[in-house]
C-alpha cells in the first residue's frame, strides 16, 4: 500500500516508529468512556434518556492521540468516529490504517504482542465487529452501519439497510416498492461509488484477517461487520441492472463531504481511497431537467404498480 494515501501513513519518529504507549493518557481514558455514551438512568420518578456517543469529541481525541502514537485501539475508535461522521468512506479509510500498521509495524503497533500473545489486539476489534450472541457486545458500530443510506432519491427519499431489512421482515410490499423507486431515482454515479466503496471495505477486511492469520497468533472475529457489508452488497446486486437515466457525475468539490465513497484502486494490502462524495438527499428538490425526467419516470412506474 502507498502510505502517502493515508492521513497517518507516517511513523511517529525513527527511534520510536509507533510512538509511546498511551494506555494511561487522559485522552485515551476519555475515549474509552466516551465511546460508551451514557446509559438510561432513573432518578426518583424521572427517567433520564440514554445519550449516544459524542462522535465529534471522540474524533477530536482520537485525532489528537494519533499525533503521538500508532495504537490499534486508537485507530479503531477513530474508524468508528469516521463512520459516524462521514459514512462508509470514513470506515474504509480507518480500516486501511489498521491494515497498513498491522502489516508494516506488527512488532511496534500498540498494544505490542506480549510474548506472542495478541489477545489485547483481538479484543480491541470487538468494537468494530462484536461477536454474535455475546450478551455484553457493544453494538454501536453495527447500528451505525445499519443506518448508512444505500439509495438516495431527491424526491422519493433515502433508505438505509435498516429500512430495507424492516420492509423485508415485515413483508411490507408498499415500503419495498418505495425503496425500489428510490433506487431507480438515485443518480447512477453515486450508486456505483457506494458499491465500489463496499467492495473495497470487504477486500480490506479480508486482508486484515489474512495479515493476522500469517502471524499465527490469532485472528480477529470480523464476521459480523463482514456479513452486514455483504448484505449491503447483496441489496445492490438484487436491483435492476438498468438505471432510468445516467445523470452527470457529481464532483467532490460540488457535493457534500458526508458519506463519501471511494473509487477502485486495489492492491494486495488494501485499496487507495479516491473520494467521490455522495449526495445528501433533500426531498422535493429537483436539480435540473434530468432530475425531473428521472422523477417522472419513477413516479409513473410507482403508479402503474400500485394504482393501475
Which stretches of residues belong to each language-model region?
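N-terminal domain-start signal
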Residues: 1-114, 123, 131, 140, ...
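Mid-to-C-terminal functional-domain signal that highlights helix-capping/loop sites
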Residues: 111-293
